[in-house]
């Protein structure tokens, strides 16, 4: 409703609304913008908006954008000035995108601290369906599985701390956003869901038919591939900068560690006891706001002879 002729002076416009509204704003912008204006978006699905762009005849003006950084938390209070630092920023030009416009947007994403990555819109949607959309759906389903199968005294919920809470952290994401994502990237998500269900069926059949090699091969292949994934670039699912420490259950144990870190200007995001340590974690888990603080804390506490457990 606020789109008026003042937009006619814009050389670059970012559409930062929910995906389902972008097409409406494109339609309103079309008669207003000048011929050399660049329009981009920050939506997590691309094929849908590219279809709208083509129908509106805005292919020369539009370059799709997807900053691959985010958080499971929503709202202004959870904003992060370093959100795009070392994060991939996907750009999806159209067949009619002007090369100089792509160069301009590429340079801008670099100035933001991000790493530009150019790809086709359909390939983008297939990729994010696999590495982001499916994991979010699986995490939400796992949490609801515990909720629905727990007994009346809530023993599953009580014991679900630690590893389970870590692997399902992204289930806390915005329901509205994920409803829209599944609507706009339906085909790609359904394809990868079918592949995943086939994989689960093979695992189930292997367990049912008592074929131990099925499970061994599953974890052997996944471990090898996961270890080859870089930790140096921020991705679609926000990273956790944390580690655990082996500490004795004595008065003052936590405060001593907190004091050591504070004396060295290292800020703690969260600190707490690990009650479920089946993954080999230490009794105390500490989370930080960034990777540098995390690395500094590891080095510092090791110098005080603390036993640090870092998970790859």
Label each region the model flagged.
Residues 16-18, 43, 93:
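Glycine-rich, N-terminal phosphate-binding loop of Rossmann-like dinucleotide-binding domains
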